[in-house]
Amino acid sequence: TLPERKDFDLTPRELEVLSLLPSGATANAIGAVLFLTEATIKTHLANLYRKLGAANRAQAVSIGIENKLITNQ
């Protein structure tokens, strides 16, 4: 059987931000795509890192892919 997907209690917006991280986009660029300020994106990133137990973007992307929260792009 496949391992169960962990959702880490991420909000829909946090999942949206996580899905944009593999592109290497800056917080400002992600904000432009989602019509949010850079500060708001940085808050979402801080929450993502905390919930995922990630130290940085690369680790967040790795955890996201391993847990099927994002697909390889």
Task: Map each language-model feature to its residues.
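Flexible loop/N-cap segments at domain edges
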Residues: 53-55, 60-71
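Short, locally clustered residues in the helix-turn-helix/winged-helix DNA-binding domain
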Residues: 19-23, 65
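Intrinsically disordered, low-complexity segments enriched in glycine/proline and serine/threonine
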Residues: 17-19, 41, 45, 71
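Acidic-residue sensor for enzyme active/binding pockets
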Residues: 14-16, 38, 66
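Recognition helix of helix-turn-helix DNA-binding domains
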Residues: 24-59
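Regulatory hinge/linker segments at domain boundaries
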Residues: 1-20, 73
